[in-house]
Amino acid sequence: MAEYTRSISFYGREIDINIGLMAPQAGCGVWLTSGETSILVTATRQPGRPGVDFMPLLVDYEERLYAAGRIPGGYLRREGRPPERATLISRLIDRPIRPLFPEWLRDDVQVVATTLSVDDTVPPDVLCILGASLAIHGARIPFNGPVAAVRVGLVKDEFILNPTYAEIEAGDLDLVVAGCADGVIMVEAGANQLPEKDVVEAIEFGFEAIQELLKAQQQVLADLNITPVELPPPPKNEELIAFVEEQAQEGIRSILRQFLDKTSREQQLEELKAKLEAQIQERPEGDPLRLYLLENPKELDNQFKALLKKLMRQQILQEGVRVDGRKLDEVRPVSCRVGLIPRVHGSALFNRGLTQVLSITTLGTPGDAQELDDLHPVDEKRYMHHYNFPGFSVGETRPSRSPGRREIGHGALAERALVPVLPKEEEFPYVVRVVSEVLSSNGSTSMGSVCGSTLSLMDAGVPIKAPVSGVAMGLIKEGDEVRILTDIQGIEDFLGDMDFKVAGTRAGITALQMDMKITGITVDVVEQAIRQAKAGREFILDKMLETIAAPRPQLAKTAPRLLTFKVDPEDIGKIIGPGGKTVRGITEATGAKVDISDDGTITVSSSVGGQAEAARAMIENLVRRVEEGQVYLGKVTRIIPIGAFVEFLPGKEGMIHISQLAEYRVGRVEDEVAVEDEVVVKVRSIDHKGRINLTRLGISPEEAARVRNHHH
């Protein structure tokens, strides 16, 4: 492709587009630059592999630390496993483009976004979505685009388009909305308990701005003479369709109307499908349908699922009844328990229908904060939420592996939902980690994690500002007919058109995540879903608060105890000591852990009472300013003919002249004191060189006793 360049102005920012200069062997390489951020996005297509019955799309966001002028740490000094943020951006690019490919496309498609340079002001993720849309079209891959995305912030009650990191931090909203010609296709948001109406206005504001990016893309495609690539659907086997409908339609309808639980429903559906397979096998060997299924063994299952999807959706659209008998806006039964697990700092078991999540809270010290090594300006996290989804939660056997993209994404969503209600570091200096173990899954385990984690944090005594609950909303849409479902279960997610997760407090929303399986919905439908979700969230929240109404007033006995105080930043070196010798000595002597911040904030933690207080006393003694007239208990460190040296504070030593050892005349220093003797001394004077002169004279018996008692 010949090199093509174009610059577009978008709400005060210039976006430079270059197609054809880079990655000549990729299907298409799009180089985008905005400010000092530069991204290369490629799209490549290969013929599909035999037997694949799904669309194998792979989206990767590659962070390179050279983009910020940094060299990676570690022995190899090169990037390793993608950081969590890169995984989340990969998902953010994937989610708005996936629904726009024809569902029958079986070719391998890969989209790779590589950061070449980034500034430290604006996130690069929405630029990647623009590049992905252009690259897919440029690679002549069948795609119902273009698609674009924008970020919306809210600062001082005003919406801001593509806000800076500083504006996001200062504001009450961080929302990414993606859309195409047919409507909104993806929403991702974190908010500071924002009212529903404000969130809807933000989505509408962003969707209107997206139209400019869609028009700009259309102009680029017209300049390059790129027209949409049509991929007609594969021919249908009408005989198979008729056979499945004739033999299974009434059976499926009957199963759906029995309002069975998940296990019983799946068992009956499998038995019905097995009967169809048996009927096929009973046909003569030369029967055309039998021969077709021998060549296409997955087609019977595919057609059976298609009929199940059609009938389930009809039942919802025409009768307003769901597969488990619930109304469209009804939440499954909810039950909760807290404090189940001994020794942990907080625990909760949350049940909603057949979805069950166990959330465990652990409190740590400031040194336990997660250090981040990526291109984001934030370099550590005080709150971590980890989500695990084992095979047994859906009745499957599979090996346990490191967290995949889904686990990372669900954990990040639950984390985003809870961060706005966590106490400030000054009020609660603990680092908090919550792990959500999915023990049983039948829809919306991420929102189950939000609910379970709220309960677990309250059980741990974390003073959250308000409890958070979450619910997943679904959609069934046929033409103009729309039905929104509250608290979707697995089959409604799988056969429906939308998965819209909403989390928040009574005051407002803290997190949103909307994904579509169709090519977009109107803002009005989004608003309806958000409003219906509020009723569902509040129903769940009421059930949660019946279990525990407020955070426990005290932390668990097993939680570390923290003492936080300030010292002069100039004294940090004294506390650390050469090579860390002094602070290690404090830790070894007391058993407490010491964390030191650059601003002079000291956090001392211990699991045993008294250890933290002892460490604090040692640190305060280290940095205490010595003044004339102060009395200390010290230890004799060495003796010289004219006096004795005494260490009266860690690292601080003074000399008692022989004339100051006693009221009477002392002939030899050794006659009065010996090395290692404890002596009560008073600061007599400090000379211009900082040398400290001590005395044993002029100290009352009461004062000496007080100092000895305080020390011991």
UniProtKB/Swiss-Prot annotation:
Record-linked SUPFAM superfamilies: Eukaryotic type KH-domain (KH-domain type I) (SSF54791), Nucleic acid-binding proteins (SSF50249), Polynucleotide phosphorylase/guanosine pentaphosphate synthase (PNPase/GPSI), domain 3 (SSF46915), Ribonuclease PH domain 2-like (SSF55666), Ribosomal protein S5 domain 2-like (SSF54211)
Domain S1 motif positions: 629-697
Domain KH: 560-619
EC number in record: 2.7.7.8
Compartments it resides in: Cytoplasm
PROSITE patterns: KH_TYPE_1, S1
Sites where the protein binds Mg(2+): 493, 499
GO cellular component terms listed in the entry, alphabetical order: cytosol
One GO BP: mRNA catabolic process
EC category: transferase
Keywords: Cytoplasm, Magnesium, Metal-binding, Nucleotidyltransferase, RNA-binding, Transferase
Reaction(s) the record says it catalyses: RNA(n+1) + phosphate = RNA(n) + a ribonucleoside 5'-diphosphate
Record InterPro entries: ExoRNase_PH_dom1, ExoRNase_PH_dom2, ExoRNase_PH_dom2_sf, KH_dom, KH_dom_type_1, KH_dom_type_1_sf, NA-bd_OB-fold, PNPase
Pfam families: KH_1, PNPase, RNase_PH, RNase_PH_C, S1
GO molecular function: 3'-5'-RNA exonuclease activity; magnesium ion binding; polyribonucleotide nucleotidyltransferase activity; RNA binding
Cofactor(s) required, per the database record: Mg(2+)
NCBIfam families: polynuc_phos (TIGR03591), PRK11824.1 (NF008805)
Family of this protein: Belongs to the polyribonucleotide nucleotidyltransferase family.
Function statement: Involved in mRNA degradation. Catalyzes the phosphorolysis of single-stranded polyribonucleotides processively in the 3'- to 5'-direction.
This protein's name: Polyribonucleotide nucleotidyltransferase
Higher taxonomy: Bacteria, Bacillati, Cyanobacteriota, Cyanophyceae, Synechococcales
Name of the gene encoding the protein in the UniProt record: pnp
